């Protein structure tokens, strides 16, 4: 079964009790305040030595947990990200359950690739964002973004080329306003986003 066809199944909240409720300095150095880390329930899994990022659906139900290797330098034999609790990521706009009211209030949505991007924007006072979980965007995510009925601003990593963003924009119906922030002056490093 294709991932988009799998139902999003809520998992028990008690799963989060397996992880330590710790904030971390790496996210802080990357622009995610301790307060924001607590808001998004960032934690730590001792068993896998990973920072934990709970994944919630549009209604706030826990549907997965993503783990990021705890150290900035990742050895070649270790995956940087794994799902400690798997979910149908292609059906998720990370953060939407928390940011929907800000999206409606500010009449726009910033779309980033990674969950941490939503947290960085939140820390900077831009609470109207969601993450796709990567540069590939699914029809399910396109439909959810379209239903927000607000202008959509893509703020993807610098390594995503303008033609890739144009191809994404072409997947939306013509009535949807699509914008993208692109670093044409080479201010950012490859994995940074505007």
Where are these regions (language model features)?
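TOPRIM metal-binding catalytic domain and adjacent DNA-binding surface shared by DnaG-type primases
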Residues: 1-52, 56-59, 100-103
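Phosphate-handling DNA/RNA-contact segment within nucleic-acid enzymes
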Residues: 46-149, 164
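A short glycine-rich beta-strand->turn/loop micro-motif centered on a GG-aromatic cluster
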Residues: 129-136, 179-187
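Conserved catalytic cores of soluble enzyme domains
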Residues: 135-180
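Short, surface-exposed amphipathic charged segments that create phosphate/polyanion-binding patches used
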Residues: 143-148, 188-194
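Conserved nucleotide-binding/hydrolysis micro-motifs of P-loop NTPases
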Residues: 159-160, 186-188
